[in-house]
Design a protein with these regions (language model features):
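Histidine-/acidic-rich catalytic cores in large beta-rich domains
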Residues: 2-10, 27-31, 42-215
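Solvent-exposed serine/threonine-rich low-complexity stretches and specific carbohydrate-binding patches
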Residues: 15-27, 152
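Short, flexible loop/turn segments at beta-strand junctions in immunoglobulin-like
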Residues: 34-39
Length: 215
């Protein structure tokens, strides 16, 4: 594969997501990364790609049917909780911004699992604030087109792997940097870990910003 164009076919009345995939991203992911699938839905994805085969370059087109599973998370058991994710209510959209995507970082409701521990020190940090993350990308129709499945990196039973996720930045390479509790991390939108590190011991907890340096 030399390059690719991807189009996620929108639901009826929905918002199209279409993008180009560079050669470097094809090599990084070992194939075509697909972004913007509707959760718990049978998506149609159109892929147009250039490939070199036996010395010849040709353009090919494929249409894939891809079911994406439902949004996942840790339910709190609170009586007011009606779903694992909040709903977006779109009031008005300007036509020139109709193709925009919005990154939203929100907080879930704590439950018994997330409230087991606290630093045994009156000068402790943010461990008390054990809100599970609700981090999504929504389109201008209010549909969730990406969500952070935090279950593999945010562990309520581990005091060094939980805490409020904050300070999200999208870097020039497209990857996200952020911090939570005793950690700071960098992942791409496909869920590939670049790094996930403990804070130095001199820090109490992560709060609230993480600014990537020029290098």
């Amino acid at each position: 594969l030399l390059d690719a164009d991807v189009r996620v076919v929108p639901k009826k009345g929905g918002q199209e997501i279409a993008y180009k995939v560079s050669r470097s991203q094809l090599l990084t992911h070992g194939g075509v990364p697909v972004f913007g699938l509707y959760a718990d839905y049978q998506n149609q994805v159109e892929v147009t790609a250039k490939k070199r085969f036996k010395g010849q370059v040709e353009t090919v087109k494929f249409i894939y049917t891809i079911y994406a599973g439902p949004i996942t998370g840790i339910p709190s058991g609170a009586p007011h909780e009606k779903s694992l994710m909040f709903k977006a209510n779109v009031k008005k959209v300007s036509k020139k911004f109709a193709d925009r995507l919005y990154f939203v970082n929100n907080l879930g409701t704590p439950n018994a699992q997330t409230m087991r521990t606290i630093w045994n020190n009156p000068m402790g940090g943010a461990m008390t604030w054990q809100f599970p993350p609700k981090t999504v990308i929504i389109d201008t129709k209010g549909e969730i087109r990406w969500f952070l499945d935090y279950r593999d990196l945010w562990k309520p039973e581990d005091p060094y792997s939980n805490g409020v996720m904050m300070g999200f930045h999208q870097n020039p390479d497209g990857c996200l940097t952020f911090g939570f509790g005793q950690r700071y991390a960098k992942y791409d939108l496909m869920g590939r870990k670049i790094w996930n590190r403990r804070l130095p011991n001199a820090y109490a907890d992560f709060s609230h910003a993480l600014d990537p340096a020029q290098n």
